[in-house]
Amino acid sequence: MIQGLKDWLYLFNSGQDFQSYNRFGAHEVSPGKWSFLVWAPHAQQIKVVGDFNDWRGSPLTRQGETGCWYGELAAQKGQLYKYKVVGPDGATHEKIDPYGFGFERKPGSAARLLDIPRIKWHDDSWLSKRSKWRPYAEPLAIYEVHLGSFIRDTHAGPDGGYMTYQDAIDKLIPYVKELGYTHIEFLPLMEHPLDASWGYQLMGYFAPTSRFGDPADFLRFVDAAHVAGLGIIMDWVPGHFIKNTDMLAQFDGTPCLLYTSPSPRDST
């Protein structure tokens, strides 16, 4: 079990923890063993289904009155998984992990076992410059871009002809530098199922979309941009909440992660 889980769940439930991604979701606790923690207070039962158990389901254990469910399973990095949730009405639905760090390529929606990536950063000079930056006294020019349509091969196959994060290092960064911009602002890069939404209907709040590569690839892009003297701004849209039945809406059989009002103003 994660060290100090009971104490941490107390902090979470009392609103005293602000880095829940370090606990919730899937994390490798030892080589070949992963922990799974999910908040679903109204669920009757939760199982983890994935490549590591032939999608048959391994039950999680309810953690008292915390609303959380926890378990540890033998699994390997890169394998896919979902939660099978039995709601208060007895209906069962497969759901994505709200804290997944990565997902399979569309049209699939399973989360992928990935811990927070670690890369070698080269942007010390940029960070030092940023700490001294005077935003109201120095030039600021922002290039806003939707990476999925910046350069795209419309005749490509099932991969959609998307640029990769590496392509963006090679093509986008020099282009923006040549134009004289100081920052790149991305339209939402978090995981989303529908291309036409431009990323504004989120499913993975903690995962850069797999359309362009894995999370480590994205970090390398940010590093390369900083080395080139460019800041990165992310358009993050937590209010745009996808309602697909296998995602976050009615997650535990109730709108526990969503407004209870059916008004279209409250969610998308």
Q: Locations of the language-model features?
A:
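Surface-exposed amphipathic alpha-helices with a cationic face
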Residues: 177, 219-227
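Conserved, mostly hydrophobic/aromatic
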Residues: 38, 83, 145, 186, ...
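Aromatic-lined carbohydrate-binding/catalytic grooves of carbohydrate-active enzymes
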Residues: 152-153, 159-163, 175-217, 241, ...
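Short proline/glycine-enriched turn/loop motifs at strand-loop junctions of beta-rich domains
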Residues: 39-46
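Single conserved hydrophobic/aromatic residue that forms the stacking wall/gate
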Residues: 259-268
